[in-house]
Amino acid sequence: MCTAAAFQTKDFYFGRTLDYECSYGECVTVTPRRYPFSFRHMGRLDAHYAMIGMAHVADGYPLYYDAVNEAGLGMAGLNFVGNAQYAEVQEGKENVAQFELIPWILGRCATVREARARLDALNLVGTPFSEHYPAAQLHWLLADKDEAVVIESMADGLHVYDDPAGVLTNNPPFPQQLFNLNNYMALSPRQPENRFSGALGLHCYSRGMGALGLPGDLSSMSRFVRVAYTKLNAVCRDTEAENVSQFFHILGAVEQQRGCCEVEPGAYEYTIYTSCCNATRGIYYYTTYDNHQLTAVDLHRAELEGEALSSWPLVTGEQIFHQN
């Protein structure tokens, strides 16, 4: 289970939480402009946009969970188990395996508008990376500073949906998630007025009562509502530090604590990492479950003209500043 969000202030920010019961050794990874992407059905891509994101590197290949390219386009894959279904290879189509979708789009496209044209010809196939890495059932949030879309491949084909909320979680399919927000249109950051009955002297006895009914559980539909409400009502300031901090607070609204979501006896889903990339500047910030200090990796401080990946292992231990 995961949550992703796109957030526009003075700069454009894109990030996500990764919620799962175990880590796969992911690290912050920069793919330079001349790293040779070898696609299973579409040949090689030897020159492309550089990108930065979180990836598990297997056999020298970056399996990106989320990434942002140097043009400011961001993309994240989130679990879509039970609904995701991929096609068979078809002649005359751009046959791209699901694990290749992030580099296929981010390597070639600078905007969502450009990506839409690519997606029109896309045939998303279930070719696995290897026998050890079967095709993951995913859907994707794709966003730039101007718009966001959700990409879902299902039994009835490939869908690209406008996402005015700029957020994504997991099941059910995106149209149901967006429609469900109708049930929460009365939520407000302001204190409510008594509309129950003029015959009763009802009054607010606490701050925050305008958001009564905002779901607080960890299910994906509830997290969609909560992160959308938090993001769309968040107040922004002027500095990079303040905006990055605010983005982490937005995703903190859906953070999962170890012990609250048991997936099997003794195994618990929790927020392994939270990311926030300033897509305008190419700076990737993250925290981990046991380290709340922000760590940053700058795309433009890496070697971008070479062919070799650059990776940084996550700082996972808590960093405590002692004041005395």
Q: Where in this protein do the model-derived segments appear?
A:
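Proteins synthesized as precursors that undergo proteolytic processing into mature forms
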Residues: 92-128, 240-249
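Catalytic cofactor-binding cores of redox enzymes
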Residues: 121-159
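Beta-strand residues in well-ordered beta-sheet regions across diverse protein folds
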Residues: 15, 76-78, 151-152, 285-287
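Broad, structure-driven detector of short, well-ordered beta-strand segments within folded domains
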Residues: 28, 68, 149-153, 275
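C-terminus-biased signal that marks the final domain/tail of proteins
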Residues: 1-13, 49, 128-130, 135-136, ...
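A contiguous strand-loop segment
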Residues: 1-94, 126, 311-315, 322-324
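Short, surface-exposed beta-strand-loop junctions and turns on beta-sheet-rich folds
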Residues: 20-23, 81-83, 156-159, 166, ...
